């Protein structure tokens, strides 16, 4: 539910901006990144991004974002500096994960197989890899997609592994809610500004059940923003 709230709100921003809907979640993340973080139109920490998945390039960008700070994601943040460090640390891990995911796809491609190699040690293989990685940026929606996979398919396995893991998950759901509400507030503010107050009021005043969640609100925003933009 958390992820689909983030996804729907991000998709609503894209729909409000240009009226488009993407075919898949990665397409939505790419469109959102190009139109918002890449142009400086989102608030921190949702603005954090790297512009390339070439390892040498994104590591240079990460060093600038770290500003000399380091942070362990197993340690609970206690202040702004810690929180900034945690966001940057997760971005770094996400960049490495998306790089690996892209490389795995390259290895299965016809172009790679034509090189008659099994890894990226040759110059030709590295050039093919980097040509695919250089144009791939990464920002918050990509990280949310990765987090959804981790939460659904991996981290749940460790929930019963004793007091240590349970203590690390204190306030977990509350923290997820804070992130979703913050992202939804930003998305709603953009949609209101982009579509105009009269259309925004129609969206925000739409009758909804009292138990309606932030994720459901994001889904309605996505649907209405696309419809409103297509009429304008």
Where are these regions (language model features)?
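Terminal alpha-helical segments
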Residues: 1-232
